[in-house]
């Protein structure tokens, strides 16, 4: 098991809860083997010569007695909720949260950066019906995500679950620029999808959680990725604004440790890396 990643920024504690690290083919992230091999700093943390690292993880934010889980395992629904696997993954995740000191019953808010998957926002009960996985939490999404979903919900496996939870009054929304907790601010970026939002921590900001703007740290070197983003130029422009200023970057889908600093055309592992 990888060492736990924890950051302290002012009165906020951020803790990464890792479910699994995996190696996957580059085309899953819109990359090629040539792209992977072009990144000099890929090994050993982020990629091999032929595959890149990814994770299923969740970030826990603790501030002033409140507990928020940010984008819990927001990918790979076809694996996490495969009917053939039953409740194996949800049961294992619930046990993991308990073991890591964050029982699901203690979470106040499930903060989702954009509507795309179910992840561990919800689970099927014994009757096969979808219910919130965090029983005492409100689900919070960017207002732009809610507006975009109401306008064009699409026809994806997650669509019906989101429709059910929204209609049941389980979902709240926040505006662009909203302060989630003192020292944590939302920024609507779009680019990946209409409501995609990143979150900044501290006054610098000292850290930025990127959501799916960079599915892998390799995307910080490989440039435009139209396979991942309907607005690749916009995504790349936003990412460029997060380099060379000393901030820590956090990626929810990145392999352990899931954080680093972008400086001088390289991505330096961890929060303590020199810049």
Predicted regions and their residues:
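Residue-level marker for the onset of beta-strands and adjacent loop->beta junctions
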Residues: 1-3, 55-57, 128, 176, ...
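Metallo-beta-lactamase
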Residues: 1-102, 106-118, 124, 133-188, 206-213, 238, ...
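Short, P/G- and charge-enriched loop/turn segments at secondary-structure junctions
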Residues: 44-49, 127-128, 186-187
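Metal-dependent catalytic neighborhoods of phosphoester/phosphodiester hydrolases
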Residues: 120-130, 260-262
């Amino acid at each position: 098991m990888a060492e736990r990643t924890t950051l302290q920024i002012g009165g906020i504690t951020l803790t990464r809860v890792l479910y699994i690290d995996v190696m996957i083919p580059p085309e899953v992230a819109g990359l090629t083997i040539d792209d992977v091999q072009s990144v000099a700093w890929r090994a050993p943390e982020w990629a091999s010569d032929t595959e890149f690292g990814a994770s299923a993880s969740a970030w826990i934010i603790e501030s002033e007695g409140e507990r928020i889980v940010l984008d819990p395992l927001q990918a790979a629904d076809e694996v996490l909720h495969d009917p053939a696997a039953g409740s194996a993954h949800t049961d294992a995740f619930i046990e993991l949260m308990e073991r890591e000191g964050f029982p699901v019953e203690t979470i106040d808010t499930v903060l989702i950066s954009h509507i795309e998957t179910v992840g561990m926002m919800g689970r099927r009960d014994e009757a096969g019906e979808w219910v919130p996985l965090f029983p005492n939490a409100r689900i919070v999404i960017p207002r732009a995500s809610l507006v975009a979903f109401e306008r064009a919900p699409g026809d994806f496996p997650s669509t019906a679950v989101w429709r059910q939870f929204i209609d049941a009054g389980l979902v709240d929304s926040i505006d662009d620029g909203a302060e989630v907790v003192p020292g944590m601010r939302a920024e609507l970026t779009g680019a990946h999808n209409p409501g995609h939002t990143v979150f900044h921590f501290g006054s610098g900001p000292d850290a930025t959680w990127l959501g799916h703007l960079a599915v892998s740290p390799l995307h910080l070197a490989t440039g435009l990725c139209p396979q991942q983003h309907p607005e690749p130029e916009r995504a790349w422009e936003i990412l460029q604004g997060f380099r060379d200023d000393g901030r820590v970057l956090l990626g929810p889908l990145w392999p352990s440790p899931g954080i680093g600093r972008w400086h001088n055309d390289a991505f330096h592992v961890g929060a303590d890396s020199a810049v």
